[in-house]
């Protein structure tokens, strides 16, 4: 996969893209990450990428020319049209399902804005997606693009050492992930559940499944509205409700 980031602040990405999973993914050639300063594409004699909004108002608006030219340059040698994703608080809420969808693409371009906003023609005629990572406002789209890049890249084949970890992640199954424990079995009187040390894998799987359901019901009950529960899950859910 190829991922290009269009930004005015490329230095922000150095640490994130040069460490942990994203670094390993690049070393394995699972992904090619490029950070591009779209100011390099401006034709303004003052090297500017923004201007005052028509009709008046506070703030500056990103002009279309450098962003259009940057995207066109990055895609001139590609056969398949890439997904051009605008980081925007007005966009579609980012979810695990969206991450899985984007992970199936060959080429992604993330456009990170600053200032008051984007010229509307960028939205109407250039981008394919607008994505928000939450109902709050950031200084720019850089942090949001890092979040999405990390979420997408870890889904690529061969990136994670254990595929089971990916499958069992919170949201991948529609439920929040179950609790985890490690040594020691007794820490200051706080003990690991006996079932996890029983060696009975069937009982362990059932415990983890039920605890995932419990955690989802307690912390994110809205997720259960989107999930068709199995007969066993419905039974467990009734037990969980009685235990509350």
Curated annotation (Swiss-Prot):
Keywords: Cytoplasm, Methyltransferase, S-adenosyl-L-methionine, Transferase, tRNA processing. S-adenosyl-L-methionine binds at residues 113, 133-138. It is found in: Cytoplasm. GO terms for cellular component: cytosol. The keyword Methyltransferase applies. It catalyses: guanosine(37) in tRNA + S-adenosyl-L-methionine = N(1)-methylguanosine(37) in tRNA + S-adenosyl-L-homocysteine + H(+). Its main location: cytoplasm. The keyword Methyltransferase applies. It is an enzyme of class 2 (transferase). InterPro entries: Alpha/beta_knot_MTases (IPR029028), tRNA_m1G_MeTrfase_C_sf (IPR023148), tRNA_m1G_MeTrfase_TrmD (IPR002649), tRNA_m1G_MTases_N (IPR029026), tRNA_MeTrfase_TRMD/TRM10 (IPR016009). One of its GO terms (biological process) is tRNA N1-guanine methylation. GO terms for molecular function: tRNA (guanine(37)-N1)-methyltransferase activity. Its EC number is 2.1.1.228. Belongs to the RNA methyltransferase TrmD family. Specifically methylates guanosine-37 in various tRNAs. Homodimer. This is tRNA (guanine-N(1)-)-methyltransferase. It comes from Bacillus cereus (strain ATCC 14579 / DSM 31 / CCUG 7414 / JCM 2152 / NBRC 15305 / NCIMB 9373 / NCTC 2599 / NRRL B-3711).
């Amino acid at each position: 996969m190829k991922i290009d980031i269009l930004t005015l602040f490329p230095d922000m990405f150095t640490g994130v893209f040069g460490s942990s999973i994203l670094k390993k993914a690049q070393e394995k050639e699972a992904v090619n990450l490029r950070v591009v300063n779209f100011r390099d594409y401006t034709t303004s004699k003052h090297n500017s990428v923004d201007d005052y909004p028509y009709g008046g108002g506070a703030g500056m608006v990103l002009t279309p020319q450098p962003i259009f030219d940057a995207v066109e340059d990055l895609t001139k040698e590609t056969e398949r049209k890439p997904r051009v994703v605008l980081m925007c608080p007005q966009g579609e809420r980012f979810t695990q399902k969206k991450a899985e969808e984007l992970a199936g693409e060959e080429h992604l371009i993330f456009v990170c804005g600053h200032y008051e906003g984007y010229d509307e023609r960028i939205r109407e005629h250039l981008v394919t997606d607008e994505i928000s990572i939450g109902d709050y406002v950031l200084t720019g789209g850089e942090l949001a693009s890092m979040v999405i890049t990390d979420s997408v890249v870890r889904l690529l084949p061969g990136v994670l050492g254990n595929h089971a970890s990916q499958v069992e992640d919170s949201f991948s199954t529609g439920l929040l992930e179950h609790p985890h424990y490690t040594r020691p079995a007794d820490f200051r009187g706080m003990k690991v559940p006996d079932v996890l040390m029983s060696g009975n894998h069937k009982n362990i799987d059932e415990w983890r499944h039920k605890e995932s359901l419990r955690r989802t019901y307690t912390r994110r009950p809205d997720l259960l509205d989107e999930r068709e529960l199995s007969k066993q899950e419905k039974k467990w859910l009734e037990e969980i409700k009685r235990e509350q």
